[in-house]
Amino acid sequence: MTKTYIAFHKPNGILSTMSDPEGRPCLGDYFSNREERLFHVGRLDKESEGLILLSNDGAWAQEMSHPSFEVVKRYRVLLDRALDPKDLRAIKSGVALEDGIVKVVAIKAQQRNVEIAIHEGRNHIIRRLMEALGYRVERLLREEFGSIKLGELPAGRWRHLSSTELRKL
């Protein structure tokens, strides 16, 4: 079987699962015409959008998802209000949540717009980080997964990864 590697722009409101017993919209709805089974690399919560990788190579998908590889993921976040400079400093130092300290790789903020890079994949990590500091995330978009970029790929569309992109991962 030929190995397939896909970059998909997950729209807001879609579950990061290949099927849902309750019939809610999910990733599998976009790939139901494919014969091979696809595995998603990591997850984005239902309210988040952006780049998610899929493959019929289960071992690769599991490897890319494993925290030990510390793959950096970059996000664009829109907050309900401007990020205070003291909170920006706190995020750079590390913020304690109930399941441990969150350390970011990089962060830039301009008013309500925040660009954040993180290699952790804990559940709702960016939303929980911002909520711990008193902010509400209005939009969360994953723009990069390692060296793979979302670019201009429209929501709900997908493309194959190039051999160059796969090598760089």
Which residues are covered by each model-predicted region?
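Basic, flexible Lys/Arg- and Gly-enriched helix-loop patches that mediate nucleic-acid binding at interfaces
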Residues: 1-169
